[in-house]
């Protein structure tokens, strides 16, 4: 495969920008990419209330068919310059596995690519979007009881996302597996040793299920993170286990394509040796 970005958002994203599909594609071509996966946030399950203050986590149900139709046209328009994959970033939400499976059974056949990501953590009957803001993360810490409890819940939920039966169209690539680190400079994991153990256990599960990892550059431009998801040390462990790493910029605007590419290329190249 040539230069590929496997995690790109779109003008359909309510918390992104209105940069057009053409803007993303032209920028990708200028950067030397040969293929892109557009992976917009899939609609949240019916019955689940978006807990974010702006309630802007995902595309609406009423927009989904238009998204797929529009991308089908873009795919044809650029077919001689860029291979475009129609995809979605699907949220794993504890307690909504059945609804997610139903959604995937309906829309999975229409997709070329997909990611499975954890953004929401469950506590009793409440959910927290742990990458929304430092303020929301702080409320989660108070609710869960400690920073460690938030980190532990994140990795436990990630584990469930990997092991859950979500049907034949379940995404086989795990999105930004260390997203809980987004605000780590303000809320560092109390025990880096404990966190690394959790991360290595996740890698073993990914390996066991034959999945791949979204090697995500967005953390490099998050001021309280400053590293990829997962960080280089864990990415190298994944390579050693034979887990495929798929680069993803997680761009929410055209100019963010290739975020982290230069820093991450050595590890990406190692898996091809």
UniProtKB/Swiss-Prot annotation:
Q: Which InterPro entries match?
A: Histidinol_P_phosphatase_HisJ, PHP_dom, Pol/histidinol_Pase-like
Identify the EC number(s).
3.1.3.15
Pfam families in the record, alphabetically?
PHP (PF02811)
Pathway assignment: Amino-acid biosynthesis; L-histidine biosynthesis; L-histidine from 5-phospho-alpha-D-ribose 1-diphosphate: step 8/9
Reactions listed under catalytic activity? L-histidinol phosphate + H2O = L-histidinol + phosphate
Would you say which domain of life the source belongs to?
A: Bacteria
Keyword Hydrolase listed:
yes
Example of a GO cellular component annotation carried by this entry? cytoplasm
Q: A biological process (GO) annotation for this entry? A: L-histidine biosynthetic process
Q: Which UniProt keywords apply?
A: Amino-acid biosynthesis, Histidine biosynthesis, Hydrolase
The molecular function GO annotations come to: histidinol-phosphatase activity
Q: Member of which family?
A: Belongs to the PHP hydrolase family. HisK subfamily.
Q: What is this protein called?
A: Histidinol-phosphatase
